[in-house]
Amino acid sequence: MAGTNPRAARIAALIQRVVASSIERELHDKRLASITVTEVRVTNDLQIAKVYWTQLGHEGHEEGERKRAQQALDQAKGHLRSLVGHKAGLRLTPQLQFVFDEVPGEAHEIEDILAVAKKRDEELARVRATAQYAGDADPYKHDDEAEAEGDEFESDEE
């Protein structure tokens, strides 16, 4: 959303709803079939709205589909802006900039890394459960043991 301007935050939410519903209902472009609008950020002066979007793609074809979807969004930018202006009732409608949202893809990568780390932790826990100490379980001398040894030496000397 926007920084500190509550009006910009409200307009960003409105733009997100209008753009998402328009892509789904009014734009009959196959390139936009699997588009999801994830977030909209509006500048505090309400001049520019960055529309972040993501796309569910088929393995191996994501890059090409993403480029085609970006082209379709750029072509529909004027129509979407006029719809936003009409539904929002704004004197000046923000300029729409469509930006591909990298966060979901990065989130999947992080989840994969965490899954590998969890698997390693489980394996380490299994190894640790059957592990034995190389020497004594507690190799350090404690004060009560040192005193007992000291008493033995004193009794030998007497």
From Swiss-Prot:
Any one GO BP annotation for this protein: maturation of SSU-rRNA
Pfam families to which the protein is assigned, alphabetical: RBFA (PF02033)
Kinase among keywords: no
Annotated spans, Disordered: 130-158
Top-level taxon of origin: Bacteria
Regions of compositional bias (Acidic residues) in chain numbering: 145-158
Transmembrane segments: none
Keywords on record: Cytoplasm, Ribosome biogenesis
Matches recorded under InterPro entries: KH_dom-like_a/b, RbfA, RbfA_dom_sf, Ribosome-bd_factorA_CS
Gene Ontology CC: one annotated term: cytosol
Subcellular location: Cytoplasm
GO terms, molecular function: ribosomal small subunit binding
Family named by the database record: Belongs to the RbfA family.
Function according to Swiss-Prot or TrEMBL: One of several proteins that assist in the late maturation steps of the functional core of the 30S ribosomal subunit. Associates with free 30S ribosomal subunits (but not with 30S subunits that are part of 70S ribosomes or polysomes). Required for efficient processing of 16S rRNA. May interact with the 5'-terminal helix region of 16S rRNA.
Complex and partners: Monomer. Binds 30S ribosomal subunits, but not 50S ribosomal subunits or 70S ribosomes.
HAMAP family: RbfA
Annotated protein name in UniProt: Ribosome-binding factor A
Name of the coding gene: rbfA
